[in-house]
Amino acid sequence: MHSLRLIVVAIVASGLAVSGQAAEKAPDFNRDIRPILSRNCFACHGPDEHDRRGGLRLDDRDAAITEVDSGARAIVPGRPDESELVARINETDPDTTMPPPESNHVLTAAQKQLLAKWIAAGAPYSPHWAYVPPHAHAPPATKQVDWGNNWIDEFVLGRLEAEGLAPAPDADPVTLVRRVTFDLTGLPPTPAEVEAYLADTRPDAYMSLIDRLLASPRHAERMAAWWLDLVRYADTVGYHGDQPHNISPYRDWVIKAFLDNVPFDRFTVLQLAGDLVGPAAGEHPDEPALASAYNRLLQTTHEGGLQLKEYRAIYQADRIRNVSGVWMGATVGCAQCHDHKYDPYTSRDFYALGAFFADIDDEKHMDKAGFSRQNLNATPTVREPEIKVVGPFDRDRAAELDARIHSLENELPPLVLPPWAQPEQPEPETVVAKRLELERLEADRNAIDRKLMVTRALAEPRQVRLLPRGNWMDETGMVVQPTIPTFLGDLSAPGRPTRADLAAWLVRPVAQGGVGEFTARVTANRIWAICFGTGLCRSVGDLGGQGELPDHPELLDRLSLELIRSGWNVRDLVRTIVTSRAYRMSSDAPADLLARDPDNRLLARQGRWRLPAENVRDT
C-alpha cells in the first residue's frame, strides 16, 4: 500500500496530461467527475441509503469527506495521497480494488488521473445541472459578424470559433425546402411546391415558406404525432386480447391544440387535470374533458379474474413514469422498488407522485366480479366513467345531420302499399332510396357521436401506500399523501393537493415554488431534437445522473427561457430554430471534420438522421 501511495503522489505532482479539454482546464464536477462516479460508484455509494455499502456516500460532498465505517475517509480535499478513494481505484488486489471486478466496471487511466486531480483541487462539488434553473446567458462575442440570422447562431458560432472551426455552407435550396417540409409537416414537398420555392426570388421567400408550413394542418398533425408518441398513445388496451378502445377524440384534440397553438403550460394543465379545472375563456366546454383523456393512456387489462390491487399498482406506476419522463425528463420509475441509485428521488417520492392520481376512477375499467363482460371490459368505450363527447369542431355537423335524419324519418311512410291502393304514396324504389340515404346519414352521425375514455375524479381518493420493494401484496408500507419530490421543495397547496396542483407546479416559475424552467428545458430540448435529429442534451428522456451533459448548455438555457418568455409558445420556438442559419447549414462534412466531431456535437453542420417511421409511411 505504501508504494501505491507513492504512485498516487507522483501522478498528482507530475500533472500528467489528460486527453481532451479536461487536460487544459481544472476538472469540472458535472462535466468530468459526476459521470465517472455515477456510472461506476453510485449504485453502491449513492442516494439509495438502503443498499449503500460501507456507509460511504459519494453523491454528497459532506458525506463523501466524512469518516466511514472502516475509519477511513474516501475523500480528503486537497490530499489525494490520503484519500481512500484514490487508493482503492489504483489497487490491484481484486478483494479491495474499486470498482469491484464483479461489477464489470473498469476505470481508465485518464479517469483515475481526473479523480486524483479533482481531489487535489479541493474536491469541489456542484449541483446537478438539470436541477439548477436556466440562466439568461448572453451570446458570446464572435469574430465573424455577418453569419447568423438570430441569437441561436451567435451561440453556435461562438462555440465553433472557440474550437477553431467554421460553420458549414448553407444547404442548397432543394435540400432546404425538403428538410424543412419534412421536419414541420412529416411529409415531403410536392414537385410543384419545390418549383414554387425555387421560383420565389423575394428576400423573405424562406420566411414565407416557414409561415405557410407552420399554419398548415399538416404541421399540427406532425407535432401531434411527436406528442402522442411521448404519452404512449394507442388505440388498443395493450394487454392480453389487445382489444380496441376509443381514445381517438383525444388524438383529435391534440391535433387541434397544436393547430390553435395552445400555450404549452395550458396544454399541460388540461391534460393532467382538465376534469378539475374546467374551460378557460375562449375554450370550448368539451376541451378539458377531451384533454383529460391523457390520464387514460396506459396499458389496461381485460383479463378475467384479475387482481384489482395488482393492476391498480401497475396503472399508478405507469402514470408516474410517463408524467415524470415527459415533463420532468426524469427516470422516477427507478424509485418504484427502492430509492433511486443515481438521482435524489426516493421511493416515498415515487408513491407520493402516484397519490396525485389516486382520485381517478379506474374501478369500472376492471371487472371486480372476476370475468370479462363485453359491455364492461372488452368494450371500454361504452362504460362509465365515460361521457358521450361530440367534438367542438363536429357539433354543427352533428346538428345538421340530426335535422336531415329527422326530416327523412318523417317522409317515410310506416307501411308500403301498392301504388294503385294509395296513389299519393311514393313508389317502393323511392322508399328504398330514402332508407339507404337514412342509413348513410345515421352512419355519419354515429361516427361523430363517440364515447371517449375521460377522467372522472372520485369524491374520496384512494389511499396510497409505499409498496416495499414494489410488492403490491405488501401493505406494511407507510401511507403517503400527494406531494412533489422532497428535494424539489414543498407544494404548499391548501388541503389535499390535486392533479391540478401538480400540473400548476410543473409550469410555475421556480421563484414561485414551481419547476417551470426545468419543464421548459426538457421541452425545448425535445423540440430542438425535432429539427436537428438529437437534443442539445442527447439523452432527451433522461436529464438525470445517468443522462448526458448538454453539448451547448448556455444555448439550451436560453431556449428554455425563450419558451417561457413567449408565453410557452411552441410554434414561436420552432420558428426561431428553423429560421436560424445553423438549421439551414449543409449536412455534408469534410473528412477532417468527421474525424474530429463524428457525432456533430459542436454543430459545425446540420445533422443526419433517419426519418421517423410515420414520415416514411405517410410519404
Where are these regions (language model features)?
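Positively charged n-region of N-terminal signal peptides that target proteins for export
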Residues: 1-6
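Bacterial N-terminal signal peptides
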Residues: 7-17
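Beta-propeller blade termini and top-face loops
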Residues: 223, 228-246, 250, 276-319
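Short cysteine clusters
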Residues: 41-44, 334-338
